[in-house]
Design a protein with these regions (language model features):
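Right-handed parallel beta-helix
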Residues: 73-76, 99-110, 122-135, 152-165, ...
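C-terminal motif of bacterial Sec signal peptides marking the signal peptidase cleavage site
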Residues: 15-17
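Short, T/G/N/S-enriched strand-turn elements that build extracellular solenoid repeat scaffolds
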Residues: 35-42, 56-65, 70, 117-120, ...
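Bacterial N-terminal signal peptides that target proteins for export
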Residues: 1-7
Length: 417
């Protein structure tokens, strides 16, 4: 037995040594074994380079070695094809549980579950990566394309995701995050920042999704509440795709035609964005209570507080309202939803002399001729009649700028913003 183990180890080391001598790993007769063995025997800090071509894979590739870079020759040149992935062989395409991981210049296609998942680590960088379900929008597609969860120091840049049945780019329960210069389309949610602290989301294109960009905090998760997000200089347009999310998932309730939704997150600044032609609403600021979903989480804060919306460009949109409260309120809102829709729900326990403290308010200014509605759902939830108003007067003013996340240039594997 010892001799067999020794022989196996020698063979694996020889395989990697040959790969290093011969250059990048090339597609061959058993791509699953070749790539998984390379990941298993990689030394900390190793660069695993893949040649151009299509690697045919039938199970999850897993990595638990720190500081590894997985590098292809371009997102349209090096393709990890999981079309042959069988149930029971792992849901993800690539699963990483090690610090300081970088993946760049390759594509992941047609996974059963998530495209690339990094979980419970420090330092994760995704550069010039494409994740795609090539059949287009389908409820049976994997949930997430690029999926860091419970990660500190995340960089996602210059990447593309299409066809995710939940979110194309999903950053969950994480801290110190930069998401920039990506394109997401034909997903249920294009980009979702969830229960995360310190996120810069900028220069992205989110188009032709059900919802373009979401900043959420959800209950019943290990990491509570999200805050300190800056969303700026993004193009968020034409997110009118019918919702194809899996039943029961929170995103399955997102109305088609949603540009940006901020829900239950605090201290969020949105500025310099171009938000165009999202048929339900260009921007919605809501509490979790407005979803109508119940939860059992005493530590959860369902209210959205401290949101500053300024210097954005709003065009079109709001002409086909739908979703939970559209029928009841669209007539009161003038037959269409304005550019900015606020549910009007505030935490009654935080009122001071009947008013919301300045630092917890919604402020809206310098958005051109953007219009606004307060649906006053707080009165509805209290058993009264709503006093719907389009008056922006109470929302004039500003909040301090949200601080940018930590400089990721100091974090191995996470680049420089």
């Amino acid at each position: 037995m010892k001799r067999n183990i020794l022989c196996t180890a020698v063979c694996l080391l020889a395989l990697v040594a040959c790969a290093e001598q011969d250059g990048p790993l090339h597609p061959g007769d058993n791509d699953q074994r070749t790539l998984q063995e390379a990941l298993l025997v990689a030394e900390p800090g190793a660069v695993i380079e893949l040649a151009a071509g299509r690697f045919e894979l039938d199970a999850t590739l897993s990595l638990d070695v720190e500081g590894v870079t997985l590098r292809g020759q371009g997102m349209d040149e090096t393709i990890l094809d999981f079309a042959g992935q069988a149930p029971g062989t792992g849901g993800e395409g690539v699963l990483v549980t090690a610090n300081d991981f970088t993946v760049e210049s390759l594509a992941v296609e047609n996974t059963l579950g998530d495209g690339i998942k990094v979980e419970g680590t420090t330092g994760a960088a995704f550069r010039s990566v494409r994740v795609e379900w090539t059949n287009g929008p389908d409820t049976n597609n994997g949930a997430y394309g690029l999926y860091p969860v419970q990660v500190t120091n995340v960089l996602i840049e210059d990447s593309q995701v299409r066809g995710a049945s939940d979110a194309g780019i999903y950053v969950g329960q994480s801290a110190n995050v930069v998401v920039r210069r990506n394109e997401v389309w034909e997903n249920v949610a294009g980009i979702e920042i969830e229960n995360t602290t310190g996120a810069d989301v900028y220069e992205n294109r989110a188009h032709d999704n059900t919802g373009g960009l979401l900043v959420f905090s959800l209950p019943e998760l290990p990491v509570k509440d999200g805050r300190d997000a800056r969303v700026y200089d993004n193009d968020i347009a034409d997110n009118n795709l019918p919702n194809f999310g899996k039943e029961g998932a929170i995103v399955s309730t997102i109305p088609a035609g949603s540009g940006v939704i901020v829900m239950a997150s605090d201290n969020v600044e949105l500025f310099g964005n171009r938000i165009h032609n999202n048929q339900n609403s260009n921007l919605a600021v809501i509490s979790y209570l407005s979803t109508g979903r119940t939860y059992n989480d005493p530590g959860y804060d369902p209210y959205t507080e401290g949101v500053y919306v300024h210097d954005n460009e709003f065009v079109g949109g709001g002409d086909m309202p739908n979703g939970a409260f559209a029928d009841a309120f669209v007539a009161l809102a003038g037959g269409a939803f304005p550019d900015i829709v606020w549910d009007g729900v505030v935490n009654p326990d935080k009122l001071v002399d009947g008013a919301v403290p300045d630092e917890l308010r919604l402020y809206v200014e310098n958005n051109g001729d953007a219009d606004f509605v307060n649906l006053d759902l707080g009165s509805v939830f209290a058993g009264g009649e709503p006093s719907v108003t389009t008056d922006l007067g109470p929302h004039q003013g500003s909040l301090p700028a949200v601080p940018r996340p930590v400089d990721l240039g100091a974090a191995t594997g996470a680049g420089s913003p």
